[in-house]
Regions:
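FIC/Doc superfamily catalytic core
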Residues: 1-278
Length: 278
């Protein structure tokens, strides 16, 4: 994993040299991509172009379920909330976590009446029932509040430390895995966990990591294998692969555009500044 981290740091250096994040509309389309892939993993059927049209112009995709549109608009609003909270160095608390979850589930959450009480997923309430995913049985609902309080306290301490890019990246992956393993909500845990990962990356001014929808099977396998073996290195390696994939794609996109621009100018060097075309 150390070699992979070194490769990632070299890619980050190249990424920064190209000033990719300064490109016109780069951040907007990057956030759209995060929304598209994260919701697609959870079943949303809109294409990437349909996601862009929905978030850019409010246009719905013909023949696609309303639920899938709601998932995407809610996730986008939650991502903007996470961005602002991280940029303001907002302490990571249980209340902040619930606010993120409430935004993710705002349009698709429901009130649940159980023998243990009533909870509302659209309000970011913790589950009051036990949940399973395949062969995995997550922690008893009665333990969720205490575990989340501990999770938030430890994350808040870790995130506010003077740490380097490697440490911040690994922290974001570990938080992603640990929150998903607690599974505090009845629904939306995957999306919320990926947003918490993005919160840490925003906080430390790192490019955001995507989990690509094409790699959903490997993503689930990494989660399962990590739990079975109690070895977080498995999930870290998978996420580093996703991060490398994202960085390489962005760098390649810019380099290809540079080549096209250079050819159009007869091989003359480009002026400083980049424009990305989507």
């Amino acid at each position: 994993m150390e070699e992979e981290l070194r490769n990632i740091m070299q890619l980050l250096k190249r990424y920064d040299e190209l000033e990719i994040q300064q490109a016109i509309d780069w951040e907007k389309y990057n956030l759209y991509s995060i929304v598209h892939h994260s919701t697609s993993i959870e079943g949303a059927s809109l294409t990437e172009i349909e996601t862009q049209l929905l978030l850019d112009e409010g246009l719905t995709a013909k023949g696609k379920p309303l639920l899938h549109h709601q998932m995407q608009t809610d996730h986008y609003n939650a991502l903007l909330f996470v961005k602002n909270a991280a940029k303001e160095k907002t302490p990571f608390t249980t209340d902040l976590l619930r606010q993120i979850a409430a935004r993710v589930m705002r349009s698709t959450g429901n009130v649940h009446n159980t023998i243990n009480g009533t909870f509302d997923t659209s309000k970011g309430d913790f589950r009051l029932l036990n949940v399973y995913a395949g062969e995995t049985r997550f922690v008893d609902f009665s333990k969720v509040p205490q575990l989340i309080q501990q999770f938030c306290s430890e994350l808040n301490t870790a995130i506010s430390q003077e740490i380097n890019k490697e440490e911040a990246l690994i922290l974001s992956f570990d938080a992603h895995f640990n929150l998903l393993s607690i599974h505090p909500f009845e629904d939306g845990n995957g999306r919320v966990s990926r947003l918490v990962m993005n919160f840490i990356q925003f906080y430390h001014s790192l490019p955001l990591c995507n989990v690509f929808k094409q790699d959903k099977t490997d993503y689930i396998k990494a989660l399962v294998d990590t739990r079975k073996s109690n070895n977080i290195e498995i999930f870290r390696r998978f996420m580093l692969g996703q991060y490398r994939k994202m960085l390489e794609a962005e760098i390649s996109k810019v380099m290809n555009q540079e080549k096209k621009s250079s050819s159009a100018r007869g091989g003359k060097p480009n002026d400083k500044g980049l424009t990305l075309f989507f």
